[in-house]
Amino acid sequence: MKVQGVLLIVICLLFCVTGCMDPDHAKQLASKGSLPAQDEDPSKMMGPGPAASSASAKAMAAPFDTSTRIQDVMNDPVFGGYGRLLFPVDEWYMSGSTLRDLQLTWYNDIDPEKTVEIVNTLWQRANAGETVFYDIYTEEEKTVDPEKADTGLFFFRGEPGAKFAVCNAGGGFAYVGAMQDSFPHALELSKQGYHAFALIYRPGAQTACEDLARAISFIFAHAEELNIDTDCYSLWGGSAGGRMAAWLGSYGPAAFGGDDLTAGCGHHAIYRPQRSYRKRSAHFRLCGRKRWHRKLA
């Protein structure tokens, strides 16, 4: 009985000590990792919740939206030094400060959602390690002619080993309206499995055709690393770009300083008719709402 009484007293003393611990002492133990602090917010110990994690992942997957400033897209480090070529080099050919407000000279009906899809697609692929832009001129060539620094190919990758197309935007041979007139076409072609390039060229009919000839020659020279079938390619263009596609499709790259290559299997001109043809011209298709065949008849 004495032993049981002693045990009962010891147990009571233990309950008194632990239940009446000084709060300051409890905090000291908590700081040493022995106890959780009484005023600690449990949510802070659990890390970001599912909603926060989802929002962060979404921002990484699609960093741009219609409210994004155009300058922020141009200067995004993922794009390196070529982000500026997503938009007209001479900024007076465009207006608006955000992707929602973007307007290009001589164009209308620009779809902000498509603009966002284009820049997000390129950003995602570049961020994943893909090359989405290729220089077509060497640094030495750009030093001799600085305007060649404002050229290049944006690459919308298709299925491995697929055929390719080069899309050429219009702009009256004064600027390149790629965001409206070549990027959307290249993106949709890539969704169909084709490799598609959007050319950024120097203004002027002659220099534009020289840049297109150089671009085609570049693609042929790097076909193996690009995993591209060069057997039958197509040229696309709107307005001034349609003329480029027609001229290169008719006369071939060599006529404009490029390599001696085939003229391609087809060229597609949107908005502009072509009046000059050769026996070896590629298949030619006019696209658009107006019936250009009546003017060509």
Question: Model-derived features: where do they sit?
Answer:
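Short beta-strand/loop motif that positions the catalytic acidic residue
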Residues: 285-287
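Primarily recognizes the serine-hydrolase "nucleophile elbow" in alpha/beta-hydrolase
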Residues: 210, 214-281
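C-terminal motif of bacterial Sec signal peptides marking the signal peptidase cleavage site
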Residues: 16-19
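Conserved alpha/beta-hydrolase "acid-adjacent" motif
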Residues: 292-297
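Short amphipathic alpha-helix adjacent to the substrate-entry channel of hydrolases
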Residues: 179-197
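Short beta-strand element of the alpha/beta-hydrolase
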Residues: 162-171
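Short beta-strand-to-loop junctions in surface cap/lid or active-site-entrance loops
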Residues: 151-162, 217, 226, 277
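N-terminal cap/lid segment of alpha/beta-hydrolase-fold proteins
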Residues: 81-82, 86-160, 209, 251
